[in-house]
Design a protein with these regions (language model features):
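A short, charged/proline- and glycine-enriched loop
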Residues: 20-26
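Glycine-rich beta-alpha loop elements in corrinoid/cobalamin-binding modules
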Residues: 33, 41, 60-264
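Single conserved hydrophobic/aromatic residue that forms the stacking wall/gate
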Residues: 263, 268-272
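Residues at the starts of beta-strands that form the adenosine-phosphate
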Residues: 25, 55, 136
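Long, low-complexity, serine/threonine- and charged-residue-rich intrinsically disordered N-terminal tails
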Residues: 14, 28-32
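Short helix-loop-beta junction
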Residues: 44-56
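Short N-terminal or domain-adjacent regulatory/targeting segments
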Residues: 1-20
């Protein structure tokens, strides 16, 4: 079967022009190659956004060295940037359990192992924030979802803060993102403020204590602070237990964790 370039989500400026687009609503950056198949999460989310009327492009495996031309080639989106490390956790994908670099990457052309950096969620977001500081960046994928609170990093053998702190992203869409990314796009398209977006389920974000939506509530789960977890292993274990328990509830409770002078807030998941 013959396919045209316009049958796929655009990855270059030329492909956008073939569709008659002079502006994009959302630009997705992925640590994987772009394959229009359900095995590749960025492709799924791109197609879902497209089906909801948004102009979407994907930048697969951008070059993070040099002049960052891959991050500039499509310009700034109207709504936001989406960043995903790929279908697998990038560190598991790049390294063995003995911390030796793998010789192949199953999600890259020709199985090349040098097509993504360590922690692409952090690297890509820091570059985007340097180039477009006023454009919101939403993290997604397994890498961000598993690092949405203080977490033990096996590769560096240390307890690290939520990935929002290291990356500088505005929020995390954790878990399965098909529903939340459309709601996020709709919210930005309607001109909603970041405070209003913070009320959405499956969104993790940082804010000052005075800016926590609705303030502290009786049914909130207050996690041990990051600073406390650095000296209290049981506190970290309790945090992870709460995270796992709430992730499997039909009606989850909001979780809040203090990190330095800010608070990480994780609203509830969607009700089924």
């Amino acid at each position: 079967m013959d396919y045209k370039l316009t049958d796929f989500l655009p990855t270059t400026k030329k492909e956008c022009e073939l569709r008659g687009w002079d502006e994009l609503d959302v630009i997705l950056f992925s640590g994987d190659a772009y394959v229009d198949h359900p095995s590749f999460g960025a492709a799924i989310l791109g197609r879902i956004l497209e089906a909801n009327g948004y102009r979407i492009a994907i930048v697969p495996q951008p070059d993070w060295h040099g002049d960052f031309r891959d991050f500039k080639k499509l310009g700034r989106p109207r709504l936001f940037f989406g960043v995903s490390p790929g279908a697998m956790d990038s560190m598991v994908n790049r390294y063995t359990a003995n911390r030796r670099m793998r010789s192949e990457d199953a999600f890259s052309p020709d199985s090349r192992h040098d097509m993504r950096p360590d922690y692409p969620s952090i690297v890509y977001t820091q570059i985007l924030k340097k180039l477009y500081p006023d454009v919101p960046v939403a993290l997604g994928g397994i890498e961000a979802s598993l690092r949405r609170i203080s977490h033990y990093d096996y590769w560096k053998d240390e307890l690290r803060k939520c990935i929002l702190c290291d990356s500088g992203a505005d929020l995390i869409l954790y878990g399965m993102g098909e529903r939340s990314i459309v709601e996020l796009a709709n919210a930005f398209a309607e001109g909603k403020t970041m405070d209003q977006i913070h009320e959405m389920p499956q969104v993790a974000f940082y804010c000052k204590e005075k800016d926590i939506p609705g303030g502290f509530k009786d049914d909130d789960i207050i996690l041990h602070s990051h600073e406390e977890c650095l000296h209290n292993k049981k506190g970290q274990a309790e945090n992870v237990r709460h995270l796992e328990e709430e992730a499997n509830k039909m009606h989850a409770q909001r979780m809040i964790q203090a990190v330095s002078y800010t608070h990480l807030t994780l609203p509830t998941i969607y009700s089924v």
